[in-house]
Amino acid sequence: MSSTMRGWVRQHRGPYESSLKLIDSLPVPPDPGSDSSDIIVRVSYVALEFSIAHIMGIFPALPFAPPLVPEICVSGTVASAGGKAPEELRQPGTQVLAMTDPMSMMLFGTGALKEYMRLPEQYVVPLLQPSHSVTTDHPHGTAERPQALTLAEGAGLISNGSAAQAVVRAANVLSGQRVLVNGASGSVGHIVSQLCRARGAYVVGVASGVNQDFVRRYGCNEFVDYTKHTDLPEYLASTYGSQPFDSILDCVGSQDLYANSPRYLLPGRPLVNIGAFSMTDSLLSTLYQWSMNSWCPTWLGGVPRPYILFSNTPDMQGVLSLVEMVQQGKLKVHIDSEFEMEDLIKAYERVTSKRARGKVLIRIH
């Protein structure tokens, strides 16, 4: 293995188009010793996050911090492992899902857009969970085998699957409830819809008309084409006001949807925002609006429905449960597009367009 590797580095504050540079002189992390439980992951795919693309244009580089390598979630294979690493992660070539701690990315620059990562064992899990299988037809009778989860799909499952799982729990979605998913064709939204259906909820998905078949295929009972309605809240009120939703899961970040929610959301039931926002909004205006939604009492003009702003760090143990759902045939992960490492800027353009159906990935190896 070479002593250096390629990676994308943020050189200064500014839009990703001007602040990122691909270099080939990053040091390859040293092999863990016999007393370490760390894993060296040879990165195959990196999943891109909308929030990280936005943050690069806002936050300055921290004093004395090394150049920042962005992104946190990857899939790949074990290159080497420390002597105290879990047995299932020691074999070189083992396919894994992994992530770096977001604070480590911000403070120490240890992000994912590079060829190799050294990670603590708690941030790495094997891709295949062999204890779970699904029954399939076989020429010689019935056979059981795990539903395949590819490295690409696995990379797309880590952050978005964790976010979807946490949002559904935060809304306490239960069997028989009616749920509105805004942005049902997105990287998080299409997983949210499936998890709600898995709990027995009736799901209405909002997306553009070209995504109708996609949205229905990934869990929605009904579809609303927002492009056909100049005033979406008015349409929702007239169509669903007599049968309000038990919760609204907003994967887009629509203030109008929340401001008008008493017209189509049951009293005491929440709108949960996954932390979505517009690239055109300033950080201060976004934070101000989120704060007003969360804390402003109704007697001061606040909306009389709970507002939950949800943002979470991916939970690798939670990811394991999602991997099991995929292997059992209960969950599907859609990849919007894959880009070569050299085409990161084009990939971020796709992410920030908010037109991606599913996850956008960078292919490293």
From Swiss-Prot:
SUPFAM superfamilies, sorted: GroES-like, NAD(P)-binding Rossmann-fold domains
* InterPro entries in UniProt: GroES-like_sf, NAD(P)-bd_dom_sf, PKS_ER, YIM1/Zinc_Alcohol_DH_Fams
Its cellular-component GO annotations read: mitochondrion
Q: Care to name a GO molecular-function term for this sequence?
A: nucleotide binding
Q: List the disulfide bonds.
A: none
| Residues holding NADP(+) | S185, G186, S187, V188, Y226, I274, G275, K354, R355
E.C. no: 1.-.-.-
Origin: domain of life: Eukaryota
Which top EC class is named for this enzyme in its record? Answer: oxidoreductase
What pathway or pathways are given for this protein in its record? Mycotoxin biosynthesis
Q: Name one Pfam family in it.
A: ADH_zinc_N_2
User: What range(s) does the Enoyl reductase (ER) domain occupy?
Assistant: 21-362
Keywords from UniProt, A to Z, are: NADP, Nucleotide-binding, Oxidoreductase, Virulence
- Function as written in the Swiss-Prot or TrEMBL entry: Medium chain reductase; part of the gene cluster that mediates the biosynthesis of pyrrocidines, fungal natural products containing a macrocyclic para-cyclophane connected to a decahydrofluorene ring system that show potent antibiotic activities toward Gram-negative bacteria. Within the pathway, pydE functions synergistically with pydB, pydX and pydZ to form the cyclophane.
| Assembly and interaction partners | Monomer.
Which PANTHER family does this entry report, sorted A to Z?
Answer: ALCOHOL DEHYDROGENASE RELATED, RETICULON-4-INTERACTING PROTEIN 1, MITOCHONDRIAL
Instruction: Give the family this protein belongs to, as stated in its UniProt record.
Output: Belongs to the zinc-containing alcohol dehydrogenase family.
Put simply, this protein is called: Medium chain reductase pydE
Q: Which organism is it from?
A: Acremonium sp
Which gene produces this protein? pydE
